[in-house]
Amino acid sequence: MKKQFVLLTLLVALSSSAFAQWGRPIDYSAGPGLKDAYKDYFTIGVAVNRTNVSDAAQMEIIKKQFNSVTAENAWKPGEIHPKEGEWNFGLADSIANFCRENGIKMRGHCLCWHAQFADWMFTDKKGKDVKKEVFYQRLREHIHTVVNRYKDVVYAWDVVNEAMADDNMMFRPGASPYRQSKHFQLCGDEFIAKAFEFAREADPNALLFYNDYNECDPGKRDRIYDMVKKMKDAGVPIDGIGMQGHYNIYFPDEEALDKAISRFSEIVNTIHITELDLRTNMESGGQLMFSRGEAKPQAPYIATIQEDQYNRIFKILRKHKDVIKNVTFWNLSDKDSWLGVNNHPLPFDENFKAKRSLAVIRDFDVAADNRIPKNDWVPNPMNQPGQEWPQVNSEGYARFRVEAPDAKSVIVSLGLGGRGGTVLRKDKDGVWVGTTEGPMDPGFHYYHLTIDGGTFNDPGTHNYFGSCRWESGIEIPAPDQDFYAWRKDIPHGNIQQVNFWSESTGKMQTANVYLPYGYGKLVKGKQERYPVLYLQHGWGENETSWPVQGKAGIIMDNLIADGKIKPFIVVMAYGLTNDFKFGTIGQFTAKEFETLLIDELIPVIEKQFLTKEGKWNRALAGLSMGGMETKLITLRRPEVFGYWGLLSGGQYAPDEIKDPKVVKYIFEGCGDKENPAGINKSVADLKAAGYNAEGLISEGTAHEFLTWRRCLYQMAQSLFK
């Protein structure tokens, strides 16, 4: 019967990076605010409501993250000036006063719009339409009153909002490029010029913007461009274009956004992203009719796509920092969003907790913005025969190509740490392609594809057992890879599979056994016998991991051929690790594997193979969770093994062992991205206490197989001496 235990969140001793990865909550708001991260680029703003500027916790978020504020609705004409002679300044003033008190400048939004407008301006007291001159008089009074009231705190105004027609309004030949609003029907496009004229009169120093959505759609983009150019050529004081940025996680791509900014920068020197949010569906724009989403948590793969889209957008915005001067998020949190909480559009969730997308936006790599991978791509060494993709280059980048024509999204789980993987995008041929954002750690990595939320392997690669399933695999070139490279000019041993019955588990178990070249041959009339290293895998893996991913047999062959070690046997068995579940603190004793190893496997190995007997001819070592098993078993049963090794699997302390005579050699190792300080201290303490201890810190690696290949290579040279 299977016994399930709750694992100690992998191992506190593994490494700080691994421990964080396996479940320690991460505060993504820790670190500098967005306004500080982007101080050399552009200001970062947020649209706020009444609660945002009255709740203490929300105000602290605003003050830390943002240096520009927009009133979401309070300054719109229909809100602040609902009737002739009636003004609602209360909420508008409270937002302005919050900004005054905290030294935050404001973007004014908005003075003239077809929606949420003061429609009374179009009719007289009898409800009849007025002439445009009356409308202009009323509009001028409105603009002057609002602008003058807040000119001390406002640095920019969205003067005219959304005056251009959407693509779906352009289906008829000769259709007007303008939205058929009451403003346009009464005044033509002259109302745009008049609104800017009135705003400039009221505040000669404020920046004046035309603001619109769907600005990355080529048709809408060009209509906006043509109108603004026409107005500026006629002397209308338009200082900048506001690109609303009501995007989604699929659109726009980098090319479309880049083209829109480049196009607009031909006619204005200042562009603001005025209302940024990312829906998690395929809708976009400023329409008030949209899907509200389902009332359920955001799927992790959707969050990854959203993070990637934010990353791509801000990369383009940083590229255009000469013209992009402000980026404003439309609302503080998902709870506040006009799109509804179930669209999950913002970097703060419904509880005002920062999402990983906040860190993605904030913690950008300046060097990566303009980095172009070296064009020396070759097929991944782990590919299926004849498959060109995925590919790797000499710098450590990986790139992928996946044919999934009907998919909405494809994510490769391989990517920079903590980012959820590499999101692929469709190319012009409809094929999903993408490159890791930066160089990967060298060596072997597991990965899989997430296609529309489903998990699949990459058909281009072989499969490798890891994470309790068969995964795709990729090999990133390493500077020292010769020590695990297969060499045709040396003799090679072989690996045999051994099946044995385990009474303790009630099933057949499997071990892979490396036998060095020359095993079984007569030497001076006798068959030579060999010491044995029992070498354990980590959680989610099995007896195939060390022979295949770890290249243990090749490493042994090379060491023997180079005269660095005398031949010995290596036994790689399944360590019963995969029934243990990650989660809260529980109990893990390795007692089950101890029984299997000592009472069942060792007798089989010593009966079937030419082994030397006794503890001084046995070593036990393991990586990760296999290291945890190694430590527990060697401390409880020191009479069985004389050589001990922990590979990213924790450390020994002298007071745990108590007697240096019980062990001839202790090895401890990890990657320099794990817990090198812990390894160095432990080895120093052991040496000071009289133990023969050695440590290795693997350069440029983390909790991964190149770390453990290097550890095996180093450790093997000190075994059985």
Short names for language-model regions:
Residues 50-65, 138-146, 220-231, 257, ...:
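Short, acidic/polar
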Residues 90, 97-100, 185-211, 218-291, ...:
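Glycoside hydrolase catalytic-domain groove-lining segments
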Residues 373, 380, 386, 392-420, ...:
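Non-catalytic cap/lid and distal C-terminal segments of serine-dependent acyl enzymes
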Residues 27-34, 81, 149, 162-186, ...:
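Aromatic-rich peripheral "rim/lid" segments of glycoside hydrolase catalytic domains that contact
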Residues 22-68, 72:
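Boundary/entry segment of secreted carbohydrate-active catalytic domains
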Residues 1-23, 367-369:
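Bacterial Sec-dependent N-terminal signal peptides
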